[in-house]
């Protein structure tokens, strides 16, 4: 069966387990006076996706045993004696292959040992070593000051001219510069210097492998990349290297396929849930289950976080529909009623809404309450008040944007972003993920409420998600008649051209990343994995909106990656 079809499958729809009776309204299905969304139907065949739950890629037992054996070999490799730069390069390869989560403690132990080593002769005056050391240490929570790059400057304070010929060093410097904080001017200089020189030489690099790495990095730096997506690309790339370690490559392929088989089962179960709700038949809203699962894998791909992915995908799929109701389909009166019901977390008054909108609302309630029940059963914590609060806050932000649209009000960029960093909806997913993963002794009503208050880490995550979304979707959304986005707000406020406005928003993206980077080192009540969730949702947005709206419209780049990450296992050699 093909993974794609021209329209969603006409599978049997089972009755949704609603908590209220929806009274039909006169003219409830009328499209009169409603704006057209112009959304294309999902290109994914839901019958095929459901089949993944039972006929997913079964990893053979011999491959599971082989993976365990190779894992021990790689662990010994990490702990083995080698030159410091070689150790850093091994760790870099492991991370890019998507294997960091398998060797978290070993990697941190080796990096901390290199950090404590008082000898600096191996990295000082070596651009590649200095930059790679800086990036890997910061990525793994060990602070290194930007001053380590001072030795690479000449007497005039500029980077030494001979460094322009060191392509590998420039690439490492480029990647390191994206971990900078606000006020770290030296790293800003490093970013400009490395970007300029890499662009100058990218077409004339003699090594094909290095040339591909440079072009890949210039398209998207590692720090902005989703680990699971990057791993799928890098496994193929690593196989082409002259000095490839066969056992490391084999383990990376096996582990990728093992995790993929788990993801396939999860996706199949989610597709069944989606079809059973009946929401896949609503044509006036986006049908985005597959995109949301890809996003869930960007947020957290590790096998042990299946419940986090499940809740995040369900909520995100409903969020897209609720967003469309507020942005395009619902009348202002209907949106007021919808918001009031969610704010009270009480379905009284739902009979005042059209059936289609009521279906979305009831599925939202049922899903949130089920997640809350699972939390109470599994963790002994009542999370429903916090999930309900996140939904209520989100709907109020949506309503504000709808009122702006209906009144013709044009917000300033600052006003728009203050509302938009919450209306982008990731606070809801992050609150739920926090409730699911926080250490139980630290999980309290107050700590959960703090996440809902949008503290700095969550704020930067929301801001970046909003900015990426606007860069990718604003043109299509304005054509549909949606609320003005950040680009249009800036144009209206300053008189700038669209091109200039886009450059300004891109500048805000770079600055917001600096704020996020600093948050990763500041004292907060949060720990892993929650900190990583915040950063990784942004990386998912970067992927979907890098070349346009790859979320609402299944573009070739999102479709191809979805197939390679979720559907097709990596081929193994016959002897494997």
Swiss-Prot record:
Biological process GO terms, please?
Answer: diterpenoid biosynthetic process; geranyl diphosphate metabolic process
Q: Name one GO molecular function term.
A: magnesium ion binding
- At which positions is Mg(2+) 3 bound? 469, 473, 477
Answer yes or no on keyword Lyase: yes
- What positions does the entry give for (2E)-geranyl diphosphate binding? 286, 323, 327, 466, 469
UniProt binding sites for Mg(2+) 1? 323, 327
Q: Which Gene3D superfamilies match?
A: Farnesyl Diphosphate Synthase, Terpene synthase, N-terminal domain
Motif DDXXD motif: chain residues = 323-327
Which InterPro entries does its entry note?
A: Isoprenoid_synthase_dom_sf, Terpene_cyclase-like_1_C, Terpene_cyclase_plant_C1, Terpene_synth_N, Terpene_synth_N_sf, Terpene_synthase-like, Terpene_synthase_metal-bd, Terpenoid_cyclase/PrenylTrfase
Residue positions annotated to bind Mg(2+) 2 are: 323, 327
What residue ranges are annotated as transmembrane? none
Q: Is Lyase found in the keyword set?
A: yes
> Which EC number applies?
4.2.3.112
The record's annotation in Pfam families points to: Terpene_synth, Terpene_synth_C
State its cofactor: Mg(2+); Mn(2+)
Q: What does this protein do?
A: Monoterpene synthase producing mainly (+)-alpha-terpineol (44%) and (-)-limonene (33.6%) and lower amounts of (E)-geraniol (5.9%), linalool (5.0%), myrcene (3.4%), (-)-alpha-pinene (3.3%), (+)-sabinene (3.0%) and alpha-terpinolene (1.6%).
Would you identify the family this protein belongs to, as annotated? Belongs to the terpene synthase family. Tpsb subfamily.
UniProt xrefs under PANTHER family = (-)-ALPHA-TERPINEOL SYNTHASE-LIKE (PTHR31225:SF245), OS04G0344100 PROTEIN-RELATED (PTHR31225)
Which protein, by its recorded name, is this? (+)-alpha-terpineol synthase
Taxonomic source organism: Santalum album (White sandalwood)
